[in-house]
């Protein structure tokens, strides 16, 4: 099988990120961090602006730091030389931020929502992305949703096999009531319909020597940061 509707993939060896102090003004930044995805943030000292692509929560970070992965948009408005956020710099967002932990208040546009680490806050990781598409897998047309997988959180020399984990499950009328007969205008629990096969995928990484591929469709391989192969078939 192969791609039917791409589904294109891309490898980013420098997935820029900035690490934040986990709490700001007594509130865990994780309480509202997900709201930052898709917004623009600005360093209030550096003037650097970036688009937020994804968030890594402290419990998922190998360093224990809340980390924001970004695409830098603008450099400093003063000398156009700064390309990354400063250490110990407050960041602001171009949208209002709310959270139950903020009580009845919110963080207004342009007001600081977080503080970068005091040392080496700006880092680079690596990532692999797949776009929305349809793949022909195991005799079926399978929808694949856009997903970005972080390869190394704070490193730019990853070595992995990258691909889709294929999950198959049988959906019965007990799990999905819409499978019951509805010819009378309602779901008839006394007349369950046939079971359905559901195939879903998720983007995963494997070590280079892991060839247990029973539920794995390889899309590409990176070795010491270099993209070696991009599979065209699944």
What do these predicted ranges mean?
Residues 1-234:
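Subunit-assembly interface segments of extracellular/virion macromolecular structures
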């Amino acid at each position: 099988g192969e791609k039917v509707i791409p589904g294109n993939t891309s490898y980013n060896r420098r997935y820029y990120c900035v690490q934040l102090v986990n709490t700001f003004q007594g509130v865990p930044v994780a309480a509202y961090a997900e709201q930052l995805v898709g917004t623009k943030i600005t360093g209030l000292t550096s003037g650097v602006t970036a688009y937020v692509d994804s968030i890594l929560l402290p419990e998922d970070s190998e360093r224990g730091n809340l980390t924001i992965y970004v695409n830098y948009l603008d450099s400093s408005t003063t000398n156009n030389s700064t390309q990354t956020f400063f250490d110990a710099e407050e960041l602001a967002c171009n949208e209002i931020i709310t959270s139950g932990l903020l009580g009845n208040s919110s963080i207004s546009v342009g007001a600081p929502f977080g503080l970068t680490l005091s040392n080496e806050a700006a880092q680079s990781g690596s990532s692999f992305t797949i776009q929305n598409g349809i793949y022909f897998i195991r005799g079926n047309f399978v929808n694949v949703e856009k997903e970005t997988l972080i390869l190394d959180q704070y490193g730019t020399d990853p070595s992995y096999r990258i691909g889709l984990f294929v999950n198959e499950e049988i959906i019965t009328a007990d799990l999905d009531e819409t499978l019951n007969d509805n010819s009378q205008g309602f779901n008839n629990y006394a007349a369950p319909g046939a079971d359905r096969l559901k195939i879903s995928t998720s983007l995963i990484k494997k070590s280079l020597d892991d060839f247990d591929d029973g539920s794995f469709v390889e899309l590409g391989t990176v070795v010491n940061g270099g993209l070696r192969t991009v599979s065209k078939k699944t």
